[in-house]
């Protein structure tokens, strides 16, 4: 696997980009998560960033990438509506792992947004998408630009939802390389990694939450529910950051 030209790949249509990365992805599928991170740092351009929602299994990718690339900027898009336990988890992991945390927020405060638009998350798919654009997508785009990112690591896994089931290890999104080192991990592998390194799940895991986002669009898992039904009232799985 040789170095890849981001500018040249960005000029290709999306289908052609996928084809151009196919051989590299076939090789990356054979590597461990740690080897994928090391390969990316050697063969893909900097600056490098890692995004995290500080969700249920967030400690895995934060620990894995940060131990190989200490001080990598960790991007959090803060909506202002996270659970108190999430903010506490952020503080705990930032201190424990010595994270270089970079917090990005919408230009409008949560209160101002509600005054202007009402409660967007109660306005169906269109409202949820507008909410996500304001609070997730725009802040992430700004983060990637300000941090001059060319390679973006994230902790997505295929097992998490149907929308993630066929994601490759390496892709191009928002004009930068996107690397998913633990994309093929199952829940058992996540658990074993956490145990091995003395790490914890998000505090709400013990209360029956399989996925954690904002207070108003996250539900506890109940028997018969798919994991994606615990977010956005089952209308959407993705918050917008990992789409497009």
Swiss-Prot record:
Q: Which domain of life is it from?
A: Bacteria
Q: In which pathway does it act?
A: Sulfur metabolism; hydrogen sulfide biosynthesis; sulfite from sulfate: step 3/3
Its gene name is cysH
What job does this protein perform? Catalyzes the formation of sulfite from phosphoadenosine 5'-phosphosulfate (PAPS) using thioredoxin as an electron donor.
Instruction: Write down a Pfam family by its short name.
Output: PAPS_reduct
**Protein name from the UniProt record:** Phosphoadenosine 5'-phosphosulfate reductase
The record lists the catalysed reaction(s) as: [thioredoxin]-disulfide + sulfite + adenosine 3',5'-bisphosphate + 2 H(+) = [thioredoxin]-dithiol + 3'-phosphoadenylyl sulfate
Cite the GO molecular-function annotations of the record.
phosphoadenylyl-sulfate reductase (thioredoxin) activity
Location in the cell = Cytoplasm
Q: Which residues form a coiled coil?
A: none
Keywords for this entry?
A: Cytoplasm, Oxidoreductase
The record ties this protein, via CDD domains, to: PAPS_reductase
Q: Its Gene Ontology biological processes? A: hydrogen sulfide biosynthetic process; sulfate assimilation, phosphoadenylyl sulfate reduction by phosphoadenylyl-sulfate reductase (thioredoxin)
What's the family? Belongs to the PAPS reductase family. CysH subfamily.
GO cellular component labels: cytoplasm
Report the EC number(s), separated by commas if there are several. Answer: 1.8.4.8
Q: Which residues form the active site?
A: 239 (nucleophile)
